[in-house]
Structures are given as structure tokens and as C-alpha cells.
């Protein structure tokens, strides 16, 4: 397996669908465009890895993606609970239907990211840049979005029950049928938003 791991790290093996890589050290690996759908990457170390445009519809529970390049990656329906995203490049990735409960995504540039139908309950998105992000039908109950930039974001049908949006920028965000029960909106910019609480 050692030779295979070295080939994987160097990007020589990119068809990894269904592979069990739980707990594997793939830090700094070049997996751009790799197919890791249905793979088990729980607890894997992917810190600093190049995962641009990779298909990661997989179990990544507890994995380390800190500093990884995730631009354009496909995480649809993935299990990302307990994943570290610190300093990761995440623009234009797709997290539709993914499990991101309690995820730490604060201070990241999440512009253009697709979070449609994602489970972001209790997630930390404070000071994140979510310009034009699609959070339609996402569950953000109890999430921290304080100081987040949600300009022109799509929040249609999203659940923000008890979420903290203190100081958030919602300029021209789309908020049809959004659930706001108990959400904190102190000092939030709602200009250009047809907010009807």
C-alpha cells in the first residue's frame, strides 16, 4: 500500500471512488480532479492538499482540510462533520445537501459556494465572505453568521432559527420564505432586501 499511497500523493492515481483511506496521511497531495466519490476519508489528513475540482461526495468526518485548495470541488451530500477548513481555499465549491453540522467556516472566502439544502446547524460562519453564495433551503439554525458578508446571497427557504447575524451584510440578498424565528439581526445591513419578519 505504501507505493500506492505515494502514487496517490503525486496525483498518479485519480480514480479512487469507493476507496478506504480512513486516517490516511495525504497532506500536500496533488488530487486535483480526483474522483473520491463514496470513499472513506474519515480522519484523513488532507492539510494543504490540492483538491481543485475533485469529486468528494464521501465520508470526510473528522478529516483535516486546513490549507487545502478546494476551489470548484464537489462535496454534495458528503459527511463533513468535525472537518477543519482553516485557511482553505473554498470558492465555487459545491456543498449541496452536505452535513456540515458545527463546521468552522469563519473568516473564509466562500463566494459563489453552493450550500443548497446543506445542514449547517450550529456552524461558525462569522466574518465569512459569502458573496453570491447559494444557501437556499439550507438549515442554519443556531449558526454564527456575525459579521458575515452575504451580499446578493440566495437564502430562499433557508432556516435561520436562532442564528446570529449581528453586523452581517445582507445587501440585496434573496430571502423569500426564509425562517427567521429568534434570529439576531442587530446592526445587520438589510438594504435592498424585502425583509418581512
Q: What are the residue ranges of the model-derived segments?
A:
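Tandem repeat scaffolds
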Residues: 1-197
Amino acid at each position: 500500500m505504501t507505493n500506492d499511497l505515494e502514487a496517490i500523493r503525486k496525483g498518479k492515481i485519480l480514480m479512487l471512488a469507493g476507496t478506504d483511506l480512513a486516517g490516511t496521511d495525504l497532506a500536500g497531495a496533488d488530487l486535483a480532479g480526483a474522483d473520491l466519490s463514496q470513499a472513506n476519508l474519515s480522519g484523513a489528513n488532507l492539510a494543504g492538499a490540492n483538491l481543485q475540482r475533485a469529486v468528494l461526495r464521501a465520508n470526510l468526518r473528522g478529516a483535516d482540510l486546513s490549507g487545502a485548495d478546494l476551489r470548484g470541488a464537489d462535496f454534495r451530500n458528503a459527511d463533513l462533520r468535525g472537518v477543519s477548513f482553516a485557511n482553505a481555499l473554498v470558492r465555487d465549491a459545491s456543498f449541496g445537501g452536505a452535513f456540515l453540522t458545527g463546521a468552522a467556516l469563519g473568516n473564509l472566502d466562500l463566494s459563489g459556494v453552493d450550500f443548497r439544502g446543506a445542514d449547517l446547524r450550529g456552524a461558525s460562519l462569522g466574518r465569512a465572505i459569502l458573496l453570491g453564495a447559494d444557501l437556499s433551503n439550507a438549515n442554519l439554525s443556531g449558526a454564527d453568521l456575525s459579521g458575515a458578508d452575504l451580499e446578493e446571497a440566495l437564502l430562499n427557504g433557508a432556516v435561520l432559527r436562532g442564528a446570529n447575524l449581528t453586523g452581517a451584510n445582507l445587501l440585496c440578498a434573496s430571502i423569500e420564505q426564509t425562517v427567521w424565528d429568534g434570529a439576531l439581526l442587530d446592526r445587520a445591513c438589510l438594504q435592498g432586501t424585502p425583509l418581512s419578519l
